[in-house]
């Protein structure tokens, strides 16, 4: 029998791969009331939930294990909650040897809030619907580049850079590209930053 460990010491065997703990990166999207939040609380505990909708607390009594909820109302509060949630998950890993879950309910709202955060910086008192995001700033960066930095680098990438389980929810919308192409029954897609779906290893559509 070939002693692969002596030839390729960095290679993982089948048995080792089976024993290795799987880390989940899940995006669950759908209409309200389809069970997206419910599913999140079944993820590996502890679950630290950043709740942008103010509803998650109403179903926690149904679940066992440690669940912590941050009820947030804007981008800044969500960013602070993210830092605290990561600290909490790190403490559980170090002290209890538990790899928990970071849940954001929902990432659709985070995309809206990143836009609102940018508007507050450049156009105080206005909403994103009142601002044209097509102009370039003096630095040469477009409005959308700044918004994506708020959402992607300052928020999403911080989660993706961890070894914890991730669960994001999103609302459902029609694929307008498919509509423009003339499809009679266009597929649904998750609302929010368009690359969220590609940053997930599993995508669940809740009906």
Enumerate the language-model features and the residues they cover.
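Conserved P-loop
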Residues: 7-8, 16-104, 108-113
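N-terminal donor/sugar-recognition subdomains of glycan-related enzymes
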Residues: 12
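Short, flexible loop segments at the rims of nucleotide/cofactor-binding pockets, characterized by
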Residues: 25-28, 144-146, 182-183
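Amphipathic coiled-coil/heptad-repeat helices and related helical stalk/stem segments
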Residues: 33, 151-152, 189
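Glycine-rich, phosphate-binding/catalytic loops in enzymes
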Residues: 45, 66, 118-122, 184-185
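Phosphate-binding/switch loop-helix module in NTP-utilizing enzymes
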Residues: 74-163
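Phosphate-binding/switch region of NTP-binding enzymes
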Residues: 158-207
């Amino acid at each position: 029998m070939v002693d692969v460990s002596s030839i390729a010491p960095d290679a993982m065997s089948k048995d080792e791969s089976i024993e290795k703990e799987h880390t989940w990166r899940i995006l669950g999207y759908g209409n309200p009331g389809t069970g997206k939040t419910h599913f999140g609380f079944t993820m590996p505990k502890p679950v630290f939930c950043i709740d942008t909708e103010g509803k998650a607390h109403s179903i926690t009594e149904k679940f066992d294990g440690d669940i912590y909820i941050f009820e947030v109302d804007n981008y800044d509060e969500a960013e602070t909650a993210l830092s605290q949630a990561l600290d909490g998950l790190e403490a559980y890993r170090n002290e209890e040897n538990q790899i928990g879950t970071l849940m954001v309910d929902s990432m659709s709202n985070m995309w809206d809030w990143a836009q609102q955060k940018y508007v507050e910086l450049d156009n105080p008192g206005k909403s994103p619907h009142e601002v044209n995001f097509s102009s370039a700033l003096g630095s040469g960066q477009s409005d959308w580049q700044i918004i994506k930095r708020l959402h992607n680098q300052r928020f999403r990438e911080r989660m993706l850079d961890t070894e914890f389980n991730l669960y994001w929810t999103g609302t459902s919308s029609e694929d307008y590209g498919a509509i423009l192409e003339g499809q009679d029954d266009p597929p649904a897609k998750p609302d929010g930053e368009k690359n969220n779906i590609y940053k997930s290893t599993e995508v669940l559509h809740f009906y």
